[in-house]
Amino acid sequence: MKIREIVRKYDRKRENLLQILHEIQDDNPQNYISKKNIELLSEEIGIPVSDIAGTASFYTMFSFKPRGKYIIRVCASPPCHIMGAETIFEVISRELQIEKSETTVDGLFTLEETSCLGVCAVAPAAMINDTVYGHLTGEKIKKILLQIKKKEGK
């Protein structure tokens, strides 16, 4: 979808900036907001580039660099940390051969840390794209990754 079409859905209002940014990022196969996207959005909505970039950079869910098809966000909140989030990171890193903030060579996965997913009752937790997984263990996350790889023919 073109930026102009996305903006039209939201009546060019500043209060809709977050929704617009989410749609722009979701529309990009590499799951990020490019500098060109921000410049075009600025022209379309009449908000300075610096305001748009500042807003997007404040939120961890937005990225300015290309990412994988599957974005794995591991919660690092205190409850998740206490319940084993670091182990989840280690297992994912080992299985995918990437570190935090990296993308696999094939462009399939990106591993990110997020401050809180708001699902403390099921710690440790992670979100892969829009799906939340709770009560994670090393074995459980391995199975989830394997299912995704099979789905993608890897």
Q: What residue ranges belong to the model's regions?
A:
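Signature of N-terminal electron-transfer/Fe-S-associated modules in redox systems
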Residues: 1-154
